[in-house]
């Protein structure tokens, strides 16, 4: 395996395990990572070393002598000059290959050592930093000044562009980095990972390969803002239901994120618009039937060639209805279980509220009977020993009545707002009937509240 040319960069001081990349190159030296047949990787300096003024110095005298002799031979044979030029141009036209690079992340103390080696431009760097890749291609042994470190090649959740510069003004892109070699000081670094026993079952082989790939997946980026970026940004894809019957049995909200739902809704609305008469129902989340209507609806008596404006209006009306009756589902895939728990809690709260209302009604009836008996015993509403306790009970009941009255008024206000927004006549009639019931309840609560206040005033006067 051959790794690209590049010098290890200076990593951030704030990172506990600073990142040392092989993708950046300074203007002084270009170290290269080479792998021999024994899978041992060493760093070797390139033949040409760029100086401060941009001049190139040959690696040795033999190379310079060969270049001079070739130039003299070309001068003595001018008839072969054009042919040699054409051959050199054809060789120069070979497209540049994209380099394969990865990021080297080391512990803090070893990262400082490698950084100093890179800055010193020492020729002995190849003896002080070695990378030995294991046959599986995912594990390696990194030696920093004869200190072995266990390393693992992981896949990054994002692609990082590698740039190279010679004058620190102009940058050239050399590669896209998507892997990182993470080194740790602890771990078994001498033994290669054990190969599992070969199996003929393709399913078992596929599962094992998937398990190996998941172990080599890095869930974080290389900067602090990209912590857990794979979990936050890459959501699980929605599974497509193959059976249509199962899809009909399931609720609409379970597949609200499916891409085919929007097209299905448009098709249903289009078929309703083209129909002469329609029958439709509005069902709440708890499964109870709210509205049932049959017959022709003036708002939906549109010809088959209706305009896109009408279609958009119908779909927007459907979205409004869905928003009113079934609140939009949360988009966080990681909190699906929490959403189910919230729904169960809401149902439990509704049941608790119903029970509380029943208990309050029973307590109110009991209090009224007790007050009537007290009035009969006292004759002309004279106070006795139990008068103070009855006054306290009356005050509690008045507070409860006021709270319930406030809730009913809020519900009535919401119904009025819905009536103002909805354009469908049938829905308006339904909301109007609900509003009338709420107004009737409000009137009854007001009467009971006034009665309790009068009784309280009588007890306080006595």
Curated annotation (Swiss-Prot):
Q: Which GO terms describe its cellular component?
A: cytoplasm; transcription factor TFIID complex
Q: Where is the composition biased (Acidic residues)?
A: 333-365
From what organism does this protein derive? Homo sapiens (Human)
Q: Chief localization class?
A: nucleus
Function description: Probably functions as a spermatogenesis-specific component of the DNA-binding general transcription factor complex TFIID, a multimeric protein complex that plays a central role in mediating promoter responses to various activators and repressors. May play a role in spermatogenesis.
Q: What is this protein called?
A: Transcription initiation factor TFIID subunit 7-like
Q: Which gene encodes it?
A: TAF7L
Taking the record's annotation, the residue ranges forming a coiled coil are 342-462
Keyword Nucleus (UniProt): yes
């Amino acid at each position: 395996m051959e790794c690209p040319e590049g010098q290890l960069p200076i990593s951030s001081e704030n990172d506990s395990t600073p990142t040392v990349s092989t993708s950046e190159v300074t203007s002084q030296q270009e170290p290269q990572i080479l792998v021999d047949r024994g899978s041992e990787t060493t760093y070797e300096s390139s033949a040409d070393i760029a100086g401060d003024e941009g001049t190139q110095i040959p690696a040795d005298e033999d190379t310079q002598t060969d270049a001079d002799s070739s130039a003299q031979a070309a001068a003595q044979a001018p008839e072969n000059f054009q042919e040699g030029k054409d051959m050199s141009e054809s060789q120069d036209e070979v497209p540049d290959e994209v380099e394969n690079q990865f990021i080297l992340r080391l512990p803090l103390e070893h990262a400082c050592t490698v950084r100093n080696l890179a800055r010193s431009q020492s020729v002995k760097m190849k003896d002080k930093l070695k990378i030995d890749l294991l046959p599986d291609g995912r594990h390696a042994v990194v030696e920093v000044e004869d200190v072995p470190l266990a390393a693992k090649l992981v896949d990054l959740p994002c692609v990082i562009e590698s740039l190279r510069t010679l004058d620190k003004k102009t940058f050239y892109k050399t590669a896209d980095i998507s892997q990182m070699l993470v080194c740790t000081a602890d771990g078994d670094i001498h033994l290669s990972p054990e190969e599992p026993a070969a199996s003929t079952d393709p399913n078992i082989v596929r599962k094992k390969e998937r398990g190996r790939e998941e172990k080599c997946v890095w869930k974080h980026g290389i900067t602090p803002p990209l912590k857990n970026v794979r979990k936050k940004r890459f959501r699980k894809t929605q599974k497509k239901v193959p059976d249509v019957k199962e899809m009909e049995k399931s609720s609409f909200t379970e597949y609200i994120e499916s891409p085919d739902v929007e097209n299905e809704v448009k098709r249903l609305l289009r078929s309703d618009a083209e129909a002469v008469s329609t029958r439709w129902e509005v069902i709440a989340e708890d499964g109870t039937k709210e509205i049932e209507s049959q017959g022709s609806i003036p708002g939906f008596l549109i010809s088959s060639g209706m305009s896109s404006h009408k279609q958009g209006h119908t779909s927007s009306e459907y979205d409004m209805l869905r928003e009113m009756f079934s609140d939009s589902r949360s988009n966080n895939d990681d909190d699906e279980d929490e959403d189910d728990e919230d729904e169960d809690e809401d149902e439990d709260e509704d049941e608790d509220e119903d029970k509380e209302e029943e208990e309050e009604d029973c307590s109110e009836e009991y209090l009224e009977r007790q007050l009537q008996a007290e009035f009969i015993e006292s004759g002309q509403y004279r106070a006795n020993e139990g008068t103070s306790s009855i006054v306290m009970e009356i005050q509690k009941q008045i507070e409860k009545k006021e709270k319930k009255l406030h809730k009913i008024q809020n519900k009535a206000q919401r119904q009025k707002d819905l009536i103002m927004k909805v354009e469908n006549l049938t829905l308006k009639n339904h909301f109007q009937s609900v509003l009338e019931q709420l107004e009737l309840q409000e009137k009854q609560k007001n009467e009971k509240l006034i009665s309790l206040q009068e009784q309280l005033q009588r007890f306080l006067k006595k």
